[in-house]
Amino acid sequence: MNKIYSLKYSAATGGLIAVSELAKRVSGKTNRKLVATMLSLAVAGTVNAANIDISNVWARDYLDLAQNKGIFQPGATDVTITLKNGDKFSFHNLSIPDFSGAAASGAATAIGGSYSVTVAHNKKNPQAAETQVYAQSSYKVVDRRNSNDFEIQRLNKFVVETVGATPAETNPTTYSDALERYGIVTSDGSKKIIGFRAGSGGTSFINGESKISTNSAYSHDLLSASLFEVTQWDSYGMMIYKNDKTFRNLEIFGDSGSGAYLYDNKLEKWVLVGTTHGIASVNGDQLTWITKYNDKLVSELKDTYSHKINLNGNNVTIKNTDITLHQNNADTTGTQEKITKDKDIVFTNGGNVLFKDNLDFGSGGIIFDEGHEYNINGQGFTFKGAGIDIGKESIVNWNALYSSDDVLHKIGPGTLNVQKKQGANIKIGEGNVILNEEGTFNNIYLASGNGKVILNKDNSLGNDQYAGIFFTKRGGTLDLNGHNQTFTRIAATDDGTTITNSDTTKEAVLAINNEDSYIYHGNINGNIKLTHNINSQDKKTNAKLILDGSVNTKNDVEVSNASLTMQGHATEHAIFRSTANHCSLVFLCGTDWVTVLKETESSYNKKFNSDHKSNNQQTSFDQPDWKTGVFKFDTLHLNNADFSISRNANVEGNISANKSAITIGDKNAYIDNLAGKNITNNGFDFKQTISTNLSIGETKFTGGITAHN
């Protein structure tokens, strides 16, 4: 974060102008008394910048908003929170932005493909944005362009965890034009430019005169949101805003590069308007400078790394650094071009591509345009690069190999039709991936909720306990497409995961055969029969399958020699720290700040019965916000089994029980202490820790019960 060392008055803007350490110094002709006054204000700014005000807002609300947790889901409307004084706060009735584009450090924002934006002065601190983490993937900066401290960065891989923030498509020149494009009518009836920012600087919590320092920066656990009002639209190519007086999260060192969002009234969506540049204090009020999104600069970098080839339905061969375009089958010579490593090859208008060598594109990928079909043949040769980006309604028939020493990143809404066993891992962000061979990929990682894996052959997934498929935040869809599939556990971290069968003529059996307690957080729908059968002569009470997502099928569910629970899901919230406090010598390192924060909010939690807000847990039995799980099926067949319906479950279907026990309205419930964080090891492993306790909520069952023996 740039500290603003000098301010001066601008007749053009009618306000104070910040001059950062990166900008030209204030002119020597400036009145000395004015400069001295502004300097003292700027120095005071470093004191006032100690950031998250929890005097009337729970600390967790700032984190939940930036991390899209709790009530702050992307697109949510009419969101209100209860303040510590009992009042309601409504965020000016704004919808909630999708902050998934924010890197874990908060100092950069993905904008799609292999690109992100930040500020140029972050290069001084490698922790900020030189390596960017999204969920379980790390990306490295390979090139950049900057102007006026705004920086566009090129990464070494296509980012799969997010489609990225939508960049602002226009840059109004005046405040009145900006007010027209981005202004909203606030609760007091006036029209203002109100927005959000998400970042993770050197976080401290302020309660009156008390300050709780975390001694932490760039922590994803502490990614927090600010609510602001733009007060000046153009100040040396930047905009200036001030923070909300109630929901008050002041920017501080480490917040540089974090993204600022405004609602675009024309596009009817949130857009990224710039990145955080610096701060200053004026009359005791902190102001923040945002360097505006520079579309021209972004386009220049993208053009530098794009090599466009119009196939127009023809053939192309690639060998080493040579790419040869054949206008037709009779054209054996073709037209030859040189390709440059680290550039993206952009194919248009459909056609055929033949690899004649092992290809290493470095940080370059292959991009296919919209609405066409492409055939890729490798003749046993391999491709390696940033990934594959397929446009809407395009299909790429992939009859080549991806390098086994790398991970294929697939983005774009189009379809990758994989026709060969790859012997590699894949990470999927968008679109369809069709599997046509047994064990097509070693492991599959689905992120963002926009991708789908379609089985087109029996055993096309892996054969380990997770079947080699892992669903991280917001997950994605697995379409069984008429094929049976067995799991010991499904590695899904939240309800963004859906397992379906789109084949309406052929039932698919989804078998989950866990022999220890396990919670599946996702959804099951379509033409699926769900089974949980343990091969044993005795009932395995430990083999408990807990469903806290949803089931919607017209088919049967079958449980033998095991236990099944259907319940709702305790909504996940942000935590303050995911690792334990390793300091045991209080006299050396002081009291654990997480404990201090909990104690600071304890009186309010006692008043509102809200200990769950400060307990540093993602989920709690006593929290009031449980999602209702809806479970619909034809008949549940129980054989030597236990079945229970716990809190916040709505179950519709008949039950046929043989030597089995049924509990409707079970007082016991289950939570996953790692919910939302289950996926580990670069995306290809799964952990779960389950707790059970008394927790009572509404239960509903509709159907008939037939019991035998």
Regions picked out by a protein language model, each given a short descriptive name:
Residues 4-30, 44-49, 299-382, 550, ...:
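Solvent-exposed adhesion/ligand-recognition segments of exported proteins
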Residues 14, 114, 118, 153, ...:
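Terminal peptide-recognition signature
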Residues 50-81, 106-122, 145, 215-245, ...:
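C-terminal subregion of chymotrypsin/trypsin-like serine protease catalytic domains
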Residues 77, 81-138:
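Catalytic histidine site
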Residues 150-250, 254:
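Chymotrypsin/trypsin-fold serine protease catalytic domain
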Residues 321, 414, 428-436, 449-451, ...:
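Glycine- and acidic-residue-biased ligand/ion/polar-headgroup-sensing regions
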Residues 349-420, 457-550, 614-709:
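Extracellular, surface-exposed repeat architectures
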Residues 455, 495-497, 566-632:
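Acidic/polar low-complexity surface segments
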